[in-house]
Amino acid sequence: MNYTIEKIDENNYSLFDDMVFWREHGNEREPSQTEVSEQMKNELLNPDLYVYAVKVDGRYVGWISCVYIAKIGSRWNGHGHIYVDELWVEPSYRGNGFAKALLKKADELKNELNAMGIRLYVNVNNPIAQKLYEACGYVEDGRAIFMEK
């Protein structure tokens, strides 16, 4: 299956938002050309935010959202980590290597930014995702308790 991976910016955000709608509601909507809000434009201009989407037949079918967090101190020498915040592929498109391609994009970003590594969190109740990450070279490096406020 032919596909491309595109960085999301204000020019293609409407198409990306259509995919987010698809994920949230379980059905596609007509492509929207709604204007991108100033708040979203500012978010997309964040130099440490990287969002990439897989495009197949003119629509996005998956994405990865990454953020770069710098580390200070002599141990890190100013180099931080890439954190994968979210990785999703529409269920009917899974099994085509898109998630691996998106994770490869995170690897490329790590090299481009000279980051120390890539970190991500995976739910212990999501063994399919765990196997994907292991197949892409990720290893379990401890357990954590996830807390939010």
Regions found by a protein language model. Name each.
Residues Y3, K7-S14, D18-H79, D85, ...:
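Acetyl-CoA-dependent GNAT
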Residues Y93, G97-K105:
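Conserved acetyl-CoA pyrophosphate-binding loop and the N-cap/start of the following alpha-helix
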Residues R143-K149:
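Active-site/acyl-donor-binding loops of N-acyltransferases
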Residues K100, V124-R143:
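Conserved active-site alpha-helix within GNAT-family acetyltransferase domains
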Residues A53, Y83, W88, R119-Y121, ...:
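Conserved beta-strand segments that form the floor/walls of ligand-binding pockets within enzyme
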Residues E90-S92, N96, V124-N125:
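Active-site acidic-Proline motif in GNAT/NAT acetyltransferases
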Residues K110-V122:
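Conserved GNAT acetyl-CoA-binding A-motif
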